[in-house]
From Swiss-Prot:
<feature type="modified residue" description="Phosphoserine">
    <location>
        <position position="441"/>
    </location>
</feature>
<keyword id="KW-0399">Innate immunity</keyword>
<dbReference type="GO" id="GO:0000981">
    <property type="term" value="F:DNA-binding transcription factor activity, RNA polymerase II-specific"/>
</dbReference>
<dbReference type="GO" id="GO:0002376">
    <property type="term" value="P:immune system process"/>
</dbReference>
<comment type="subunit">
    <text>Homodimer, when phosphorylated. Interacts with TASL (via pLxIS motif); interaction takes place downstream of TLR7, TLR8 or TLR9, leading to its activation. Interacts with MYD88 and TRAF6.</text>
</comment>
<comment type="similarity">
    <text>Belongs to the IRF family.</text>
</comment>
<dbReference type="InterPro" id="IPR036388">
    <property type="entry name" value="WH-like_DNA-bd_sf"/>
</dbReference>
<dbReference type="InterPro" id="IPR019471">
    <property type="entry name" value="Interferon_reg_factor-3"/>
</dbReference>
<dbReference type="Pfam" id="PF10401">
    <property type="entry name" value="IRF-3"/>
</dbReference>
<feature type="short sequence motif" description="Nuclear export signal">
    <location>
        <begin position="145"/>
        <end position="155"/>
    </location>
</feature>
<keyword id="KW-0832">Ubl conjugation</keyword>
<comment type="function">
    <text>Transcription factor that plays a critical role in innate immunity by activating expression of type I interferon (IFN) IFNA and INFB and inflammatory cytokines downstream of endolysosomal toll-like receptors TLR7, TLR8 and TLR9. Regulates the transcription of type I IFN genes (IFN-alpha and IFN-beta) and IFN-stimulated genes (ISG) by binding to an interferon-stimulated response element (ISRE) in their promoters. Can efficiently activate both the IFN-beta (IFNB) and the IFN-alpha (IFNA) genes and mediate their induction downstream of the TLR-activated, MyD88-dependent pathway.</text>
</comment>
<dbReference type="InterPro" id="IPR017855">
    <property type="entry name" value="SMAD-like_dom_sf"/>
</dbReference>
<feature type="modified residue" description="Phosphoserine">
    <location>
        <position position="438"/>
    </location>
</feature>
<dbReference type="InterPro" id="IPR036390">
    <property type="entry name" value="WH_DNA-bd_sf"/>
</dbReference>
<feature type="modified residue" description="Phosphoserine; by TBK1">
    <location>
        <position position="153"/>
    </location>
</feature>
<feature type="DNA-binding region" description="IRF tryptophan pentad repeat">
    <location>
        <begin position="14"/>
        <end position="122"/>
    </location>
</feature>
Amino acid sequence: MNQPAPAALLPPRRVRLKPWLVAQVNSCQYPGLQWVNGEKKLFYIPWRHATRHGPSHDGDNTIFKAWAKETGKYTEGVDEADPAKWKANLRCALNKSRDFRLIYDGPRDMPPQPYKVYEVCSNGPAPAESQPSEDNAEEEEEEELQKMLPGLSITEAVQPGPAMAPYSLPKEDVKWPPTLQPPVVLAPPAPGPNLLVPAPGNAADFGEVFSEVLPSSQPQPGSLSTSLAPTGEQLLPDLLISPHMLPLTDLEIKFQYRGRPPRALTISNPQSCRLLYSQLEATQEQVELFGPVSLEQVRFPSPEDIPSEKQRFYTNQLLDVLDRGLILQIQGQDLYAIRLCQCKVFWSGPCASAQGSHPNPIQREVKTKLFSLEDFLNELILFQKGQTNTPPPFEIFFCFGEEWPDCKPREKKLITVQVVPVAARMLLEMFSGELSWSADSIRLQISNPDLKDRMVEQFKELHHIWLSQQHLQPVAQTPAMPGLSAAQGPWPMHPVGMQ
């Protein structure tokens, strides 16, 4: 009589991730795996890092192990337990799936209850017969790139005008800075709060826009940059009582070429920056072409390390029309964009008017509002009070030369840029218990302490909420309305931690 093959030798099973994972969230049998709200579109998934948070004894009841068993990659009593591999398998499945989108990528440091937030996408995956297999994925990638050039969004070239003064070229080739140590900039003070901001979406004359957007700024007496290293419990109320200590002008910028590792840097210029790809240098005589010279000039990385020849060709097609660039401008506590370049730019973010999968373009030479710190603080207060179900968004995504948002995953776009206002991220991480502090973690800059009364009131209210949370004891039951504070995570706390 033939004996059945050992379980460990059985081939892995093909399992549809979406129905299986949705069923597991509904089952409530895995600690921390639960819906964010009643709409069942967003869910928390615990994401503990064993190397950071120490060993855990909850590994026998995790969604990662369940997925390994479901797909036949782990058999109890036969295979050796490997929680790290289980986690990697599920992470890869989520990243490849079109049914899920990562909304919140988890903490940067060591909170007591780390997690991620995923969205269940309404757009289902492509039919099985159209899904590329591993064998022909590279071939289909080449075919897809071959079809991209006619669809690239580049503004029609304008008729040449009067001859301009010769461009000045840099003396040396510009090297990509993020391969070096991230820059630390001692910034001059930010523009005063009395500057008036034109209504977003209104076209403006170039000279008028730039004179209003970026007035000459002279250092003020007493302006200083301070490195602080107190404990998190001491620093948080200090920052909320003295909001001028927050890096309000800092932006984290992350460049991403399709399929390539992202390259990131932090900008600390209070007049912000211009994203460009060119060896032409901005001069005082060419403000209408390239914007003010006081902007930090941030160049896109070279595409030369893109291995695919076709992808590199199409990427260069877009970079070649990014000479004039995209200006990111901080005015007061708001972030704006002005598109100068011929390459069309699409975006998504907190202030985007288009919702869902409808493309959202940035009109050329029109100031577009991207982010409002005041609105973010209002939403953060409501979230901490339990009056809203999700934390306020603050990340901004740009897609160059292709429509966005649309049904195509962001990872498939040729050129994308993510922009994060550092102050917003810090505030959310503080109230999530996700931010650890060290002497070299951040250089906090004091530049303009005269903030509007309304913003001061917002910080005072946030400070009051934080103090109230310190007196709360951890609860043993899952809260009806999960929050992100250090004292109350989105799932019950366990004495031995979570795997």
